């Protein structure tokens, strides 16, 4: 199996043959995934030995996991930080800027008020505001990871992005009432 050497110690970027960067072209990522899946998919190895079939399954699983991580900006940013030795999900590091904490409280109150009042317009406005903040934060993360190589600062921004993703999901759920 020609990819076995890439599987053992490589990170997701190396496995996919892509540069280690937050800024990835989605089309290039998908093309790399399709190319690798075509080579390692277990259906291509049904005539192989049990060991070869098991290795093909492991490789396909690893390629799929790499694709899932790299296609999601939040997971990709967290992964890049972790490659640099910075634990994004560290329970001991939950500090956030006071301004962001205040904004969180405001968004939570707005969400609860809109939910209680079944106010679709307020939910829509909140969704737009959170989405705008998310895009700004993604641009900041891009600068921190690709431009400045500041993984610790990027990890702090990733934790903020995690909150934005959660509240975005809650807004979507509230919008379904």
PLM segments and residue spans:
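C-terminal accessory/regulatory regions appended to core domains
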Residues: 1-177
């Amino acid at each position: 199996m020609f990819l076995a050497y890439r599987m053992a110690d490589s990170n997701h970027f190396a496995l996919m043959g892509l540069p280690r960067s937050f800024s990835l072209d989605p089309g290039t990522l998908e093309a790399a995934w399709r190319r690798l899946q075509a080579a390692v998919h277990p259906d291509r190895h049904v005539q192989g030995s049990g060991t070869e079939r098991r290795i093909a399954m492991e490789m396909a699983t690893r390629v799929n996991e790499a694709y899932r991580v790299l296609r999601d900006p939040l997971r990709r940013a967290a992964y890049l930080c972790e490659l640099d030795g910075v634990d994004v999900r560290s329970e001991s590091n939950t500090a956030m800027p006071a301004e962001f904490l205040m904004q969180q409280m405001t968004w939570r109150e707005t969400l609860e008020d809109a939910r209680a009042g079944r106010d679709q317009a307020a939910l829509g406005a909140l969704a737009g505001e959170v989405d705008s903040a998310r895009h700004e934060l993604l641009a900041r993360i891009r600068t921190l990871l690709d431009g400045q190589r500041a993984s610790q600062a990027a990890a702090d921004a990733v934790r903020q992005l995690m909150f934005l993703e959660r509240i975005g999901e809650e807004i979507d759920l509230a919008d379904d009432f």
